Amino acid sequence: MQLNLGAIFLALLGVMATATSVLAEPHRHQGPIFDTRPSPFNPNQPRPGPIY
């Protein structure tokens, strides 16, 4: 019985670790990421503003 409880505890610990890493992942990238490199495959190029 002790071994079974240990296995359950380890499985629960692994699930908790993966859940926290998955939940914490989207908070690293906040706001839109604008790529400033000129490229024909780049959908997020900043628009050239008016020259003052």
Curated annotation (Swiss-Prot):
Keywords: Antibiotic, Antimicrobial, Fungicide, Immunity, Innate immunity, Secreted, Signal. Residues 1-24 form the signal peptide. Residues 25-26 form a propeptide. It comes from the Eukaryota. InterPro entries: Mtk. Hemolymph (at protein level). Highest expression in fat body. The keyword Cytoplasm does not apply. GO terms for cellular component: extracellular region. Its main location: secreted. It is found in: Secreted. Residues 28-52 are annotated as: Disordered. Changing residue 19 to T: In strain: 2CPA51. Induction: By bacterial infection (at protein level). Up-regulated in hemolymph 6 hours after immune challenge, levels of expression increase for first 24 hours and persist for the following two weeks (at protein level). Residues 40-52 have a biased composition (Pro residues). GO terms for biological process: antibacterial humoral response; antifungal humoral response; defense response; defense response to fungus; defense response to Gram-negative bacterium; defense response to Gram-positive bacterium; innate immune response; killing of cells of another organism. Potent antifungal and antibacterial activity against Gram-positive bacteria. This is Metchnikowin. It comes from Drosophila melanogaster (Fruit fly).
